[in-house]
């Protein structure tokens, strides 16, 4: 279990995440939903161990987030993080050397599914192709926690189905999958649990089906109600 207890992150006078508490259980796909600047990315970075909370605790299987937990967490940020000169094959080799849980066989299978070839250079990729490459890299790890920050950003409508199918294929009883997005309609049929974050605070969370039943609204319509200006 991945557990966040009263987690807060402040940058000077700005509070990016405020008192967040949530338990992420294996075998489920979670969606962190919210508009830009709501705190989704900051929360993910704290779970990944890239940013330290100002207060509160984050643990994975009872172990505080740190050096020991990083090897069990795969985190895909929104930014591109590959050198331009690298090809897909270079990137696969780099990750295989760096992460013991990285599978080159899975990686090449994902590349094929995403219509990417080993000789493609990072410098020549569109934003959509880069998004699919980042996804292939992270899904090829056998990590306990897989976090994907805005995995559908820059991906066209046709390719979104490829991305979603790839995520579903990775789901298993021993893995926690967390995705952040503001493209809620694309994720509604996939997610097991929805977390609505606004101004750094969780304003609603729960099993997706229970939320629909209790509100009489789809996750998409709940999103519109919560984030309507």
Predicted regions and their residues:
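The feature captures the beta-strand-to-loop junction immediately N-terminal to the Walker
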Residues: 33-35
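ABC-family P-loop ATPase nucleotide-binding domains
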Residues: 78-133
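Catalytic Walker B motif of ABC-type/P-loop ATPase nucleotide-binding domains
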Residues: 146-150, 155
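Conserved ABC transporter NBD signature motif
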Residues: 56-69
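ABC ATPase "signature
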Residues: 205-206
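Helix-to-loop junction immediately C-terminal to a conserved catalytic motif
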Residues: 48
């Amino acid at each position: 279990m991945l557990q966040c207890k009263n987690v807060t992150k402040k940058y000077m006078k700005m509070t990016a995440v405020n008192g967040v508490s949530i338990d992420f259980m294996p075998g489920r796909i979670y969606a962190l939903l919210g508009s830009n600047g709501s705190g989704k990315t900051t929360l993910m970075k704290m779970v990944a161990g890239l940013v330290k909370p100002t207060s509160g605790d984050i643990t994975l299987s009872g172990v505080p987030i740190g050096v020991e937990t990083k090897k069990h967490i795969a985190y895909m940020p929104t930014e591109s993080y590959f050198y331009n000169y690298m090809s897909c094959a270079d990137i696969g080799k780099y990750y295989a050397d760096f992460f013991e849980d990285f599978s080159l066989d899975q990686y090449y299978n994902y590349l094929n599914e995403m219509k990417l070839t080993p000789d493609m250079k990072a410098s020549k990729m569109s934003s959509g192709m880069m998004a699919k490459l980042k996804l292939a890299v992270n899904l090829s790890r056998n990590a306990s926690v897989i976090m994907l920050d805005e995995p559908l950003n820059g991906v066209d409508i046709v390719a979104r189905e490829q991305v979603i199918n790839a995520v579903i294929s990775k789901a298993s009883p021993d893995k926690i999958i967390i995705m952040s997005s503001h493209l809620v309609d694309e994720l509604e049929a996939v997610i097991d649990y929805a977390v609505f974050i606004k101004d750094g605070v969780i304003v609603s969370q729960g099993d997706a089906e229970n939320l629909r039943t209790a509100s009489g609204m789809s996750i998409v319509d709940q999103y519109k109600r919560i984030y309507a200006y």
